[in-house]
């Protein structure tokens, strides 16, 4: 049984992170930016799992930390979407360009 090399995991994580970074920097829709940030967090989680599984001293620390990070990311996404819904009700848009003032 052959295992996947560590370089494949790291390459996939780099590709996912770059796609998320590109989307977060270029898109103007706040929902898409939030999804791209979640994609970058998942790329970091993939690195944690890959290093904990394929490192010099394999242990479960990276995998447990990855689960903790996923729980925090889920809470962050829920709070972010709640803020976006409130902003949409206030301003009827979710574009980043129109959210530059703090006026209510």
Swiss-Prot record:
- Kind of enzyme, top EC level? translocase
Q: Which GO terms describe its molecular function?
A: NADH:ubiquinone reductase (non-electrogenic) activity; quinone binding
Its subcellular locations are:
Cell membrane
User: Which EC number(s) are documented for this chain?
Assistant: 7.1.1.-
- Residue ranges spanning the membrane: these are 4-24, 31-51, 67-87
The Gene Ontology biological process annotation of the record reads:
ATP synthesis coupled electron transport
Q: What keywords sit in the KW lines?
A: Cell membrane, Membrane, NAD, Quinone, Translocase, Transmembrane, Transmembrane helix, Transport
Pfam families on file: Oxidored_q2 (PF00420)
The family line of this record is:
Belongs to the complex I subunit 4L family.
Assembly and binders? NDH-1 is composed of 14 different subunits. Subunits NuoA, H, J, K, L, M, N constitute the membrane sector of the complex.
Q: Could you identify this protein by its name?
A: NADH-quinone oxidoreductase subunit K
Q: What is the protein's species of origin?
A: Bacillus cereus (strain AH820)
Lineage, please? Bacteria, Bacillati, Bacillota, Bacilli, Bacillales
């Amino acid at each position: 049984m052959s295992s996947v090399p560590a370089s494949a995991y790291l390459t996939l994580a780099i590709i996912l992170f770059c796609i998320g970074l590109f989307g977060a920097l270029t898109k103007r829709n706040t929902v898409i930016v939030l999804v791209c940030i979640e994609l970058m967090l998942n790329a970091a989680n993939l690195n944690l799992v890959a290093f904990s599984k394929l490192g010099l001293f394999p242990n479960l620390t990276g995998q447990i930390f990855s689960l903790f990070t996923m729980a925090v990311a889920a809470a962050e996404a829920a709070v972010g979407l709640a803020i976006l819904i409130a902003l949409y009700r206030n301003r009827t848009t979710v574009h980043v360009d129109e959210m530059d003032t703090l006026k209510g």
